[in-house]
């Protein structure tokens, strides 16, 4: 996958680290998949001018963002997800999972400690795996 840097937000301020790594410019693209309010705010703060944010996670509540500084003045482009059946699909999937009709444990083919991230990436490259879970 070619990751040059991996940051654990429990140990460091990811925005400060990203800005330090990019000489204060920020990242070109943010892919926010958790829906976590803090992660979304950090993503916008770490974005470079003219950068792109793809919001793929669904927040559980309203999120306050600094629209002027983090979006408007940066000229950020924001993408969401859409599709007429997206919510219907999610709700159906949730019902199936909650009812125990589908055992997703079979999808998990590997569980590795986080310090074996490189090995996990190599396994993924082979295509000979399902879901790889990294533990900390």
Predicted regions and their residues:
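Conserved beta-strand segments of alpha/beta enzyme cores
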Residues: 4-5, 77, 103
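Hydrophobic packing within well-folded, soluble alpha/beta domains
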Residues: 6, 18, 30, 47, ...
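Glycine- and other small-residue-rich loops at beta-strand/loop junctions that grip anionic moieties
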Residues: 7, 28-33, 56-57, 81-82, ...
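C-terminal hydrophobic helical "lid"/dimerization subdomain
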Residues: 41-45, 87-136
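Short acidic loop-to-helix transition motifs that present clustered carboxylates
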Residues: 12-14, 63, 113
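Glycine-rich phosphate-binding loop and adjacent beta-alpha segment
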Residues: 36-99, 136
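Adenosine-nucleotide cofactor-binding segment
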Residues: 1-42
């Amino acid at each position: 996958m070619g990751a040059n840097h991996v940051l654990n937000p429990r140990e460091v301020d990811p925005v400060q680290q990203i800005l330090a790594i990019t000489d204060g410019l920020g990242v070109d693209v943010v892919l926010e998949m958790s829906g976590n309010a803090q992660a979304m705010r950090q993503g916008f703060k770490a974005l470079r001018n003219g950068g792109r944010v793809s919001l793929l996670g669904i927040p559980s509540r309203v999120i306050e963002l600094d629209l002027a500084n983090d979006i408007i003045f940066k000229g950020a482009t924001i993408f969401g997800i859409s599709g007429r059946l997206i919510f219907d699909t999610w709700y159906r999937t949730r019902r199936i999972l909650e009812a125990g009709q589908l055992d997703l444990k079979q999808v998990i083919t590997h569980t590795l400690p986080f310090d074996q991230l490189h090995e996990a990436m190599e396994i993924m490259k082979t295509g000979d795996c399902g879901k790889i879970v990294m533990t900390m």
